[in-house]
């Protein structure tokens, strides 16, 4: 859709060949999504001695996103991880650098973590938020100039 906006294609115009080809490819792959299952039910029992949140943020030229997993440990030392939630955004039409998009992903992760913490009715032992961007880590640790 962003490509259509960039090219200023009107609603009654035919799609350019390259976009039409991409759309047909996407459409043909949709049925394969029925085969994907992700266990999302997070069961928290009294036997769990440790509850951790692990959040991940990442970005590309076209989008950025964040996801949060709940990692539980029971009395026998058995670990379990379940996806709690995720959120993504399409990169703005105004071109942003990859480091800036990575920073947007880190902000999205922080906001998502805040919402999750408000919803959970249990004590979380530790929270770990991850990014692969060393630039973002440096920005987050720097002193604000304002």
Go through each PLM region and give its residues.
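Acidic, metal-ligating active-site segments
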Residues: 55-81
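Beta-sheet entry/capping signal
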Residues: 52-54, 63, 82, 104, ...
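A short, polar/acidic, helix/strand-boundary loop motif
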Residues: 72-104, 142
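C-terminal reverse transcriptase regions that engage the nucleic-acid substrate
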Residues: 1-47, 52
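RNase H catalytic domain
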Residues: 108-146
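Mobile genetic element proteins and their domesticated derivatives, centered on retroelements
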Residues: 1, 23, 27, 56-58, ...
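Secondary-structure capping and boundary motifs in well-ordered enzyme cores
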Residues: 45-52, 56-61, 97-102
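An acidic- and aromatic-residue-enriched active-site/binding cleft used to recognize and process polar
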Residues: 59-62, 69-71, 86-89, 132-134, ...
């Amino acid at each position: 859709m962003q490509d259509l906006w960039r090219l200023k294609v009107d609603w009654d115009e035919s799609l350019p060949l390259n976009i039409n080809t991409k759309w047909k490819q996407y459409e043909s792959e949709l049925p394969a999504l029925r085969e994907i299952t992700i266990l999302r039910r997070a069961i928290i029992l009294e036997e769990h001695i440790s509850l951790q949140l692990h959040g991940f943020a990442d970005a590309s030229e076209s989008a950025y996103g964040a996801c949060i997993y709940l990692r539980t440990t029971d009395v026998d030392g058995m670990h379990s991880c379940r996806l709690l939630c995720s959120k993504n955004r399409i990169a703005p039409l105004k071109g942003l650098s990859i480091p800036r998009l990575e920073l947007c992903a880190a902000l999205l992760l922080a906001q998502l973590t805040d919402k999750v913490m408000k919803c959970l009715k249990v004590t979380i032992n530790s929270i770990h938020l991850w990014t692969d961007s060393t630039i973002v880590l440096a920005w987050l640790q720097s002193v604000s100039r304002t």
